Regions:
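Primarily recognizes the serine-hydrolase "nucleophile elbow" in alpha/beta-hydrolase
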Residues: 113, 117, 169-171, 176-250
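Alpha/beta-hydrolase active-site loop
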Residues: 149-172, 193
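The conserved beta1-alpha1 loop
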Residues: 99-105, 209, 259, 319
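Short substrate-entry loop that stabilizes the transition state in hydrolases
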Residues: 91-139, 215
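A domain-start/cap signature at the N-terminus of enzymes
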Residues: 2-8, 20, 29, 33-37, ...
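Short beta-strand/loop motif that positions the catalytic acidic residue
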Residues: 257-259, 263
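Cap/lid segment of the alpha/beta-hydrolase catalytic domain
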Residues: 132-156, 218-219
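Tryptophan-rich substrate-binding surfaces of secreted polymer-degrading and adhesive proteins
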Residues: 370-439
């Protein structure tokens, strides 16, 4: 994703990740040059949009939060992440745990100081785990949400975060049934990854200015996910989640989506696609069952409710803000955060509402026990053809000289008449490379 100077910390689509010891990364000189060109173009195009309004930048900064506690050993850590925790002074036994993921160029401490999560951890008694990536992983300190080596179950950064949750249980006595995850921008996109890859670990998640799971498969496609966004059917998005953990039958995590109406970096269309993805996973329609507005700024909330009466998915559209975490500095019960750092935007305390959605203040009951409802599946159809023919037939798209399967986004290789694949369609409009027998 584009290179961004430290004063502009939030765009989630990074340049090609740096190689890690023992984890070779793909991409040669041509890709690096292409990324450099894209970086320059996008930085020029979005630089002004990444600067918060003057009233936000000049807002007074409260005293910084207490320094986080670094955890030096929590597992094999295949993603080479760093683990920090905020532990309330009186952490109860079997406390919930919330994993928090920062945006590009940010740090765990900066996210803790400005997001307001620690305020509610101290108030309600839950542990916050802050995962932090480094420039050794990614030049812009973005989580690698679009890289197969990091966004799949058991691999890379996703596996490292999973190990952090397990360590929280063994070291701090947290309740493994009450683990949640949230993040901003690239951290929001990685939140989507974790909910899809480890649905049995995370009871709920909150994606702030993020991207649906399965959208980006490489650097180039990641740009398209950010803007203009990718339109897929709810069934296709849901299938991407199910494919992340084949055979898993539920229950599925509850998901809250937060997005600024004026976000120029990760366009608001992504909130719609996230809604489509997770409502379909839960077997729900895309028409809200309840709508409301939240004070103090008339944030528009849409809720999608299970047959048992519980909100499985909610979308919160924040008026008048761009790309960042909504905060509301102050000492009131619904206030939190600071706005002295870019991409923490004065509007509404999203951490207050996210904490409520997670049920950490006692306002949400335990999930119903009815089994999840999956949409009906249709028999798969298969086609064997060249990449050129797949694109002509609408089963694939082409970008930068390569072909990508429509729906799944799988890289089919060079766009020509020589490379041939068998593509399977299930559900309608979602194509994947067929493995094994294909009817």
């Amino acid at each position: 994703m584009p290179y961004v100077t430290p004063s502009h910390p939030a765009p989630p689509a990074p340049p090609a990740p740096a190689a890690r010891t023992g984890r070779p990364r793909g991409g040669g000189l041509l890709l690096r040059r292409l990324v450099a060109v894209l970086a320059a173009a996008v930085t020029l195009a979005t630089g002004a949009a990444l600067v918060a309004p003057a009233t936000e930048a000049r807002a007074a900064v409260p005293q910084a939060a207490a320094a986080l506690e670094r955890v030096t050993s929590f597992g094999a850590n295949p993603g080479a992440l760093t683990m920090y925790v905020h532990r309330p002074a009186a952490l109860p036994a079997n406390a919930p745990v919330v994993v928090a993921l920062h945006g590009c160029t940010q740090s765990a401490q900066l996210y803790a100081d400005n997001s307001g999560l620690n305020t509610f951890a101290d108030r309600h008694g839950f542990l916050v785990v802050y995962a932090e990536t480094t420039t050794a992983n990614n030049a812009n300190k973005c989580f690698n949400w679009f890289q197969a080596g990091d966004n799949r179950r058991g691999q890379g950064e996703a596996a490292s975060v999973r190990q952090m949750v397990a360590h929280a249980t063994s070291a701090y006595g947290t309740d493994p049934a009450r683990a949640q995850v949230t993040g901003l921008s690239a951290g929001g996109a990685m939140t989507s990854v974790l909910l899809a890859a480890y649905p049995e670990v995370f009871a709920a998640g909150a994606v702030v200015a993020g991207i649906p799971y399965g959208c980006g498969v490489d650097v180039i496609s990641a740009f398209g996910c950010m803007s203009p966004g990718v339109d897929r059917t709810p069934a296709a998005w849901a299938q991407a989640v199910r494919d992340a953990h084949p055979g898993y039958a539920g229950p599925w995590p509850r998901v809250a989506i937060w997005h600024g109406d004026n976000d120029p970096t990760v366009v608001p269309r992504n909130a719609d696609e996230l809604r489509d993805q997770w409502t379909a996973v839960h077997g729900l329609g895309q028409t809200p069952d309840r709508t409301s507005t939240l004070a103090p700024n008339n944030t528009r909330r849409s809720e999608y409710v299970t047959a048992g009466g519980r909100t499985a998915v909610e979308v919160n559209r924040v008026p008048g803000i761009g790309h960042g975490t909504p905060v509301a500095p102050g000492t009131g019960p619904q206030q939190c955060g600071a706005t002295g750092t870019q991409h923490f935007i004065a509007s509404i305390c999203s951490s207050y509402w996210i904490t409520r959605f997670f049920g950490l203040d006692g306002t949400v009951t335990e999930p119903p026990t009815e089994p999840p409802v999956d949409p009906p599946t249709e028999p798969a159809a298969c086609w064997t053809a060249s990449n050129y023919e797949h694109v002509r037939a609408g089963r694939a798209t082409t970008t930068g000289g390569y072909a990508y399967a429509k729906g799944s986004g799988q890289n089919l290789g060079l766009y020509n008449t020589f490379v041939t694949h068998t593509l399977k369609e299930t559900p309608p409009g979602h194509y994947t490379i067929a493995t094994g027998s294909c009817p």
